[in-house]
Amino acid sequence: MGYTVSSLAELGEGHGFRKVRAALGVTAFGVNAIVFPPRYEGPNHFHDSQDELYFVHRGTATFTVDGDERVVEAGGLVHVESTTHRQITNRTADALVILVVGGKDGYVERDGHLVDPEVDLPRRQGLA
């Protein structure tokens, strides 16, 4: 089949990752959705070779990118180059839903690294 259709609701409930790429059979680039619970501080991380484009679908995200903090409302887009440190925080009382698209020259494998595993691993596991 040349296309697939789904919704975030079909990919899971509650907070955490929605494996969009796997569910829809996407192979050309990485793509996931993340549902952040209220007042959640995500992991500070970077990638070896994969740039990421973030789309704020619902809510308000605070992006900290190389120490620069930006508040991004629903409908906003943020592009972060691979090795640039980034962290997403939901400082609101409502859920935050973000779509993340990543890739580099067709590379779609997982290549993320936590900046401070002692601090960031529990944050990452909080979105399991």
Region locations from a protein language model:
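Well-ordered beta-strand scaffold positions
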Residues: 34, 60, 68-70
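A short, N-terminal "cap"/entry segment at the start of jelly-roll beta-barrel domains
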Residues: 1-29, 43, 109-128
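Glycine- and acidic-residue-biased ligand/ion/polar-headgroup-sensing regions
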Residues: 49-51, 56-61
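Conserved short histidine dyad/triad with adjacent acidic residue
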Residues: 17, 32-47
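Short histidine-centered beta-strand/loop micro-motifs
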Residues: 22, 42-48, 89-91
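Short acidic-glycine-tyrosine-enriched beta hairpin
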Residues: 67-83
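Short strand-coil-strand connectors
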Residues: 27, 64-68
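Ligand-binding loop in jelly-roll beta-barrel domains
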Residues: 62, 82-108
